[in-house]
């Protein structure tokens, strides 16, 4: 259980984020979400939301609704990752990954730090990928943007450690969500078995399992854990 912690969850409708928001709320946190598809303040599927804007504006408005104290932020951007050979990369099909998954995530982190520093406490949890760790041929655009976040976790953790802020990343892969591994793929009689054969545990992970790890890092007794990129991929990496 939590002591009424205030948590902002970005990109509320993507990947495992709906489950993350529900689990944090069930643990006693006050959760506010934001998403590119939501332009107005209000509510979405029972979760309080602020309309999408620049990261600094979103964080400031959420913090204001929290009464000035942001305890944790879950920065979990997600976008489809089609297979693109490296020789076919162009600025047009490469840069959107960096703008959304890397630059956008880091800007949210910076805005959160500005809010958390005066309180000398806070937790930043990035939603990232273990793809850059294990390596998947044909996904260099996606992997490079995720690797940027994985690579900055340690640096950012050292930068804010003295202010009582922890920084970690949940590096997921082989999680059954409609964003990356939709149920239709799993149920395909040819592609499904091939997919599961790549996972040492022989199954896909569930959004609830990602949410459980996020809860531990955002709300649990894990405040001394920082600077870590934690794979959740069924022993794939």
What residue ranges belong to the model's regions?
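Canonical Rossmann dinucleotide-binding motif of NAD(H)/NADP(H)-dependent dehydrogenases/reductases
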Residues: 2-32
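Conserved mid-core segment of classical short-chain dehydrogenase/reductases
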Residues: 50-53, 78-95, 138-141, 181, ...
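Catalytic loop of short-chain dehydrogenase/reductase
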Residues: 79, 97, 123-148, 153-162, ...
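Catalytic Tyr-X3-Lys loop
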Residues: 87-107, 121, 125, 149, ...
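A short, exposed helix-loop element centered on a Lys and neighboring polar residues
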Residues: 109-110, 154
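Short, small/polar-rich loop/turn modules that mediate ligand/substrate recognition or access, typified
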Residues: 161, 166, 225-227
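A glycine/serine/threonine-rich, flexible loop-to-helix segment
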Residues: 162, 174-198
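Short C-terminal tail/terminal secondary-structure segment
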Residues: 215, 226-237
């Amino acid at each position: 259980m939590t002591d009424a912690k205030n948590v902002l969850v970005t990109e509320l409708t993507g990947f495992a984020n709906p489950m993350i928001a529900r689990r944090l709320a069930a643990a006693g946190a006050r959760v506010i979400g934001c998403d590119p598809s939501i332009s107005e303040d209000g509510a979405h599927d029972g979760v309080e939301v602020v309309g999408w804007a620049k990261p600094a504006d979103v964080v400031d408005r959420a913090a204001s609704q929290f009464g000035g104290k942001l305890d944790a932020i879950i920065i979990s951007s997600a976008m489809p990752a089609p297979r693109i050979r490296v020789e076919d990369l162009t600025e047009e099909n490469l840069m959107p990954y960096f703008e959304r998954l890397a630059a956008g995530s880091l800007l949210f982190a910076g805005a959160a730090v500005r809010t958390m520093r005066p309180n000398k406490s806070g937790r930043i949890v990035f939603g990232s990928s273990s793809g850059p760790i294990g390596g998947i041929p044909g996904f260099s655009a996606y992997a490079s943007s995720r690797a940027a976040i994985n690579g900055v976790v340690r640096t950012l953790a050292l930068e804010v450690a003295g202010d009582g802020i922890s920084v970690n990343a949940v590096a997921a892969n082989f999680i059954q969500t409609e964003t990356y591994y939709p149920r239709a793929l799993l149920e395909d009689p040819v592609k499904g078995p091939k997919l599961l054969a790549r996972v040492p545990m022989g199954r896909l992970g569930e959004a609830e399992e990602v949410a459980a790890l996020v809860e531990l890092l955002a709300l649990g007794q894990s405040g001394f854990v920082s600077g870590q990129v934690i794979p959740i991929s069924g022993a794939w990496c």
